[in-house]
Amino acid sequence: KELGINMLLTPIFTPPLDTAVGGERTTVQLIDIVQDADGSYKFDWSRLKRWCDLCLRNGIKYLEIPHLFTQWGAKAAPTVDGKNIKKFGWHTPALDSSYQSFLKQFLPELQSKLIEFGYDRDHVFFHISDEPGMDCLESYKAARESVKESLKGWQVVDALSEYSFYEKGIVQHPIVSSNHISVFLKNKVPQPWVYYCCGQSVTVPNRFFAMPSWRNRIDVSSWN
């Protein structure tokens, strides 16, 4: 709260970010998931409730939900561990019927619980896939379309460097890397969000130890 941060990434399942193909992060999901013999799922939301209570007490107004598909093009499902097995992961294509069936049950229940726990659709952000490139345009479109109805009325944003995704209406609310923001500003994209991470090291500010202090002035360079 003191730093002005009011949104927090909420690991409902392990975030599929910055992992090599076939690799994965340590499982950190908040929600326990059990699949019954008939293929339906049961969810334990108790840790999510505890998380939301903690966030509300500490001034977190918005929750960010991990990407529903893997980074750089939405070609696979993220890691979703159940009680005893890894159910979905790199071995699961994004449009696999079993994963799609899971999402169709999971997302409505998740949304209902988020509202119950104090975070309505105006205070939750969903993601499809992080930083899709042109070589992944079709897979991203297909993944986005597969959850379109489930996310209807909810906010969906994605990190983006390729302007054509916005131009074609595929990503309607881009969060643009600072070293690619120029084309978005030039084309007067309304209220663009900007981000920086480890990739923004040349010609744009960042906060690496080796940089002179004048290159740390991120707020100044982001002001439009």
Kindly give the residue locations of the regions a language model identified:
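Aromatic-lined carbohydrate-binding surfaces of glycoside hydrolases
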Residues: 1-150, 159-168
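A generic structural motif
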Residues: 154-166, 194-199
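Short, hydrophobic beta-strand segments that form beta-sheet elements in well-ordered domains
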Residues: 153-160, 171-179
